[in-house]
Structures are given as C-alpha cells and as structure tokens.
Amino acid sequence: MASNLLRFPLPPPSSLHIRPSKFLVNRCFPRLRRSRIRRHCSRPFFLVSNSVEISTQSFESTESSIESVKSITSDTPILLDVSGMMCGGCVARVKSVLMSDDRVASAVVNMLTETAAVKFKPEVEVTADTAESLAKRLTESGFEAKRRVSGMGVAENVKKWKEMVSKKEDLLVKSRNRVAFAWTLVALCCGSHTSHILHSLGIHIAHGGIWDLLHNSYVKGGLAVGALLGPGRELLFDGIKAFGKRSPNMNSLVGLGSMAAFSISLISLVNPELEWDASFFDEPVMLLGFVLLGRSLEERAKLQASTDMNELLSLISTQSRLVITSSDNNTPVDSVLSSDSICINVSVDDIRVGDSLLVLPGETFPVDGSVLAGRSVVDESMLTGESLPVFKEEGCSVSAGTINWDGPLRIKASSTGSNSTISKIVRMVEDAQGNAAPVQRLADAIAGPFVYTIMSLSAMTFAFWYYVGSHIFPDVLLNDIAGPDGDALALSLKLAVDVLVVSCPCALGLATPTAILIGTSLGAKRGYLIRGGDVLERLASIDCVALDKTGTLTEGRPVVSGVASLGYEEQEVLKMAAAVEKTATHPIAKAIVNEAESLNLKTPETRGQLTEPGFGTLAEIDGRFVAVGSLEWVSDRFLKKNDSSDMVKLESLLDHKLSNTSSTSRYSKTVVYVGREGEGIIGAIAISDCLRQDAEFTVARLQEKGIKTVLLSGDREGAVATVAKNVGIKSESTNYSLSPEKKFEFISNLQSSGHRVAMVGDGINDAPSLAQADVGIALKIEAQENAASNAASVILVRNKLSHVVDALSLAQATMSKVYQNLAWAIAYNVISIPIAAGVLLPQYDFAMTPSLSGGLMALSSIFVVSNSLLLQLHKSETSKNSL
C-alpha cells in the first residue's frame, strides 16, 4: 500500500495524520504544542482508519505561517516587486523613496528583475503592514509596487517569473509594432529630403505630386502629430507622469526634447508674423523613430539576458501525480501502481513530505524523494554535470528538476516545494541578483541627480547659443543645423534638444545589473551558486585560497583501513567508537559507523553525546565515558594517561595492519584514537580517504593564476603532509592539527597581512573560517545542505573542486564586463554631452541633430547589454583543460 495515513482538511489549511497507537495527545506533545493543537483544531475530527497519529509538521507550518504574517525578522530583507523603472534615474528614484523611510537601513533595486530588496534597522519591528506601506509609497511615486510574499509556493514563484517573462515578450511585440509605425513616418519625412539630395547629384526626379506634398509644412506637422500621439504616446505620457511625480526619467528627457521641437515649429507655423522660420517638424519624428528602435533592441537584449534563469526555471515541474492507494490493498509494495490506485493531478505546492507520487518517462521529478517502486534511468546532468544517465531502483534518491528517461517510478516525497534542491538553487540565484556589487554605488551616485543635471545643461545650452554663442561665433549660423536662413533660435533649440536626448542614464543603470544577472545565472547553470554581486566583486579580487583537507582535497568518503587495540578485541573497540560517533556528521565518523554496520556489529547504547567540532566526540557507555578523536584531545579527556611504551606498541600494531593492506600515494590516512574513562587510550582506527581526481589540477591552476594556496587541517602532520605533497602545496603553506578556532585565527592573520582570502571547506568545523574569509566556498557532498553551505557565499553544488577555479574565472570575467560597461557609460556621457551642446561647432563646424543624438543614446544602452551578453561565451577552466 502507498501509505497507511489519511489526510483530513482542517481550518486553517493544514493536515492531520492519525495512528491510534499514539492517540494520547498528552503523552505525545508538550504543553505548548497541545495548546497549539487545541487552538487550531476548532472542529471535531473522526477516526476512519485503524491508526492514529497527529503529525507535528502541519502545526509547525501553520504556526510559522501565522508568525510570518505577524512579524518578519529585521535582518531578513523583504522583497518588493516594482514595475515602471525605465532607466538608471528610475532606479535611483526608487532607492531614494525607500531610503527616505527612517525604518529602512539599506535598499537594493534591480531594474532587470523589477525587484527591490529592503533591509530594516535592528530596532524596527517589521510586519506585513510595514512592507505594504513601503509598496504604497513607491506606487504613489509613480512606480507600481507590491510585497512579494515570503514562503510562496514553488509553483507560484515559477508562475510569477514566467508571467514577467511573458509580459516582457508581449511588450517586445508591441515595441516592434511601434517601431514599424514610427519608421513608416520616418520614411515619409525623409521623402522631403530625398528630392534635394537627388537634385544635388544631378538626378532630376522625385519632384511634383506626392513629393511636393511632403515638403508642405502642414503635412510635416501632421506627421509629427502622428509620431507623438501614435508610437510615441506611451513614452510621452510616461515622461509627463514622471514629471508630475517629481521623478523625471529618460522618457521625460526624450518627451521634453520632442515637445520642445514640435511646439516651436507649431508656433512658427501658425504665427508667421514672428518670422522665426523654425520649421523642423521632422525632428520629433526622426528622434522618436531612433529612440523606439533602440528601446526595442534593448528590450530584446534584456530578455535574452534572462535566458539562463529561464532554463533553471524550466527544470521545475509545477504539476505532479499524487497516488492514492487503499489501506487494505494487498498489492506487493514493489508494484508501481495497484489495481485500485488513483492518480490525481495536483499542484506541486500541495504535495507534502511522505506523499506517494508517480513520475512517467520523459517527465521531470516535481520534488526530492526516494524511489518506492519501479526501475529507470534518470538524467541528473543539471545537478551533477554528469552527462550519463543514472540507474534508479527502490531505495535510490531522486532530485526535483532531474528527468526520468526510461520506466515509470513511484516515489516518496522527502522535501517539497521551496525546500527542494532545484528550488533552493533558483531562490539563491534570485537573492544573488538582488545583492548589488559595491561598484554599483558609483553608478547610483551618478544616476540619481542625472536627469535634473541634464535638464539644467540643456537650458544653459539654449541660453548660451541664443544669447551669446551666435554673436561670438556668427559662422555657426552657416551650419545646416541652423536651417537654410541661419536662424539662431533653430540652432539653439536643436542643440538644447541634442543635450536632452543624447544623454543616457539607461547605460549607467544597466551597466552592473546585466552583468551580475548573466554571471550569477551562468554560474548556477554550471553548478556554482554565487550569492550576489558583492560576492562576485570580492571573489574576482581573491589572491589567496585556503583549502581544508578532508572532504575538500579528498573525496570526503573515507573508509576504515585498520584497527589496533590495547587489551581489547579490535571489533570491541570498533563497536564502542561506532556507538559514540553514531550521531556525528563528520565523514570520518560516518566511515567508522559504516564499517561497524558492514561487519554487522551491534553497537551498545550511549548517553549524553557531545561533539566538539574539529576534535572529537564523547559519550557514556555502560556508565563510563568513551572518547573518539585526535590523540591530544582524547588524552585530555581522562585522568589516566598511557605510558609511552603503550603508545609505541599501539602505533606499531596499526602500522602492521596498514602494511598488509593495499594503498597508493593518492590515499590520505588519518588516525583517530579511542579512549575510555579509567583506562586512557584503548585503541586506534586508521581512516583512508582518496584524493579527488581534480585536486592536483585545481591547485596547479590556482598557482598559475598567481594565487597563493594554503592547506588548513585538523589532522595529524603525516596525513596532511602527504596530501600537500601530492597536490603540490608547499610545506611552508601546510598547516596541521588546527582547531576550528585556529583556522579562524589563521584566516584573520592572512587578511591582516593584506591578503584577500577565499576559504574552501565542506564540514561544520569549517563554518567559522568560511564566514570569516572574504569569500567562503563550500562543497555540497551528495547535495546535502549543512553548516558549511549556510556559512559560505559560494556553493559548489556538483561537488567538484575544480569549480573553485571556474567560479574565480567567471567572477573575474563578470567584473571585467561590469568595469567595461561603467567605463563605456561614463565615457559616452562625458564625451557625447559636450559634443551635443555644440563644443565642436565653432572650430570644426560639426553639430549633432536630435535624430542622431537619439540614435546614439539608444546605441549606448544596446552596447552595455550586448557586452554583458558576451559573458555567455565564457568558457570554464575545466572545459578548457579537461581532466
């Protein structure tokens, strides 16, 4: 049968699993839990099964959901979905609105993902209403915003992202239609100039009829009205609304320039007595044509920048087949489906731990779980990078996002929804893209006052050329930009419009986020999760890498290679050691437990287990304490000390055991000692662990890049020296017998000496060092999350040490693109704005037209996004130098 548990819907949404043998609530739950049960179970429930158990999970989830509504911890950023951001000025305005709230400590705004991550001051009690009030302030400032609910189901999150992508695709289609309309008008405007060009070349065609009509000022005015109210309508209205909200953006600048040119032309047309001779209706048409074309190309490039994130999301299944089987069914448990089983299609958010699911060939696993029945091969390349499919049968684990290739499988859900492996990867990538690189502050500082500065420069440009420049440099009126009659008003207005239009805060606003988006998404796709732009920037500047030994340079799958004892049977020593280490999570502890299990040894009962990370584990067996760990630590646990002759004898026995076993230079050997209260050291256990295949390559590549490599280990000198020699780390950079505190201190000393340090580790004893290092890099053995991955800022989910080099290389390439983008954006504005203002006009007789300025403005943004897209061509170091 699939399950002997039945689920009952209760208000609020939760579930009860009942099993009669444990029906006595008073015995199952402490007082606090009983009060929660009474509070939530307002309706009576009835037993319809021959078993009763009240599952604690649903109550905990209900409790947590209620608490999440009441209060959000102040150190956890809330996420706001913000729409309407068009350029760097918009980003700066959104950040300014958020930071103006006294409760806000910091805010990071991402225009590409349309999100704002807000952190509050420690003394602030953050509630859902607090977040909603910030969203309301943004909406009132012209940027529609709403709080993203934390804990939202994975299907809901996928749906939300896909809706955003779909929305961008729809906008791209509309943008193309507007461009087609705008350039039709541009072609008609150009028609009036075509005859002049052909006549100047001696080709006397294109005159009369429609050509003469296109020269008519009223027709040109009509084309300008068509451009402003047709394809340019949304742009103009958005710019006007931004002015009204006191947050002008790029649309405001373009709209102001277009309307200024149109207004002056219209006044000149309807009031000929003014003798302005300022008819340049074609300028708003040409300007909008180039701007809209650039926007369309920019939107296409930004959509393409989300490709890697979309590929990650495509791995998540939002639907699943829940299998319901009768409790009295007698079908063999290894049968995929029984005759009376029912499959129900449900959202993956409705799946709970323990549910039975059916996954057919070609389908994606919706949750993490273990195989209950069936045989198949599974494509796990998205998680492991291994191209060959992996055989799965009863008892094997499967991960969400991997693909079932061959036969149907029935699985039992072990982690669901937002807790599944692929969901955690996606969430970490989203969080990473919300963490701005410190270099972004430069762009923010410039983009904030940018629009007002440009408007001021434009007004100054108009005033200078109209009142001063045209008199000091009269020859400038001979330039085509001044019109056929050399009009100072036409010259001044066009140069002022040039300044408005050529400036581009968009390039500044896109310089960092586009590169960060592509870099973090590409890293996640390749198997290394980088927790944000700030981490990328630090990672790119690393000049020293500290490596742990066990589980980092070695495979992390140690095995017992020898046991020696003093006065005890060897199996007796192994039994005691396994009993003590049973609850420990270190790979060495697991090796001892696995060895005892493989020999079918019955371990004694223990009490009061205590683990001291990096040293060993202590527990009480038969009324006496037994310690397992390093020699010094075990000796210090007990008053009775061993004679030196006993220790020499023990070492000799162990060496003899090891000499009879096959070993190679690629094996690292560690010795742990077993001590007992009142007796001292009673035995020693040798643990062997094979070096990783890519360990030597990784160290060599790091050293080739000029990065200092050091080895930090809590193991004995001999084992550490052997590993260091095999991988190529110098003896002076090898450190052994280090406690977690000593590792932490060593990292601090390296930083004090000026090094930027990355620490690579995998266990709980590495967590302090990972947190202290400039960048902590954690390997995830068998995709299990632990303290190391929680403390690290980079996680290697495929458990490949060579990905350390790849992550460093990607970070350097990403930051290189960021600096290139910022350099381009700043240089473009510094050079183009003075040229647009006419600085070259007196001496070189060169001036831009508004349409040329609009085209350059569009190209500046396209360059930034396209340059970031080149990151997708970046090759990993591993692929360049295949092992």
UniProtKB/Swiss-Prot annotation:
Membrane topology designation: Multi-pass membrane protein
Organ and tissue specificity: Expressed in the shoots only and not in the roots.
Transit peptide: 1-65
Membrane-crossing segments per the record: 179-199, 209-229, 250-270, 274-294, 445-465, 499-519, 822-842, 846-866
Binding sites annotated in the UniProt record for Mg(2+): D762, D766
Residue positions binding Cu cation: C87, C90
Keyword Zinc: no
Alphabetical list of InterPro entries matching this protein: ATPase_P-typ_cyto_dom_N, ATPase_P-typ_P_site, ATPase_P-typ_TM_dom_sf, ATPase_P-typ_transduc_dom_A_sf, HAD-like_sf, HAD_sf, HMA_dom, HMA_dom_sf
Keywords: ATP-binding, Chloroplast, Copper, Copper transport, Ion transport, Magnesium, Membrane, Metal-binding, Nucleotide-binding, Plastid, Thylakoid, Transit peptide, Translocase, Transmembrane, Transmembrane helix, Transport
GO cellular component: chloroplast thylakoid membrane
Main location group: plastid
Residue positions binding ATP: G761, D762, G763, I764, N765, D766, A767, P768
Reaction(s) catalysed (UniProt annotation): Cu(2+)(in) + ATP + H2O = Cu(2+)(out) + ADP + phosphate + H(+)
Similarity comment text for this entry: Belongs to the cation transport ATPase (P-type) (TC 3.A.3) family. Type IB subfamily.
Function: Mediates copper transfer across the chloroplast thylakoid membrane. Required for copper delivery into the thylakoids lumen, which is essential for the function of copper proteins.
Protein name: Copper-transporting ATPase PAA2, chloroplastic
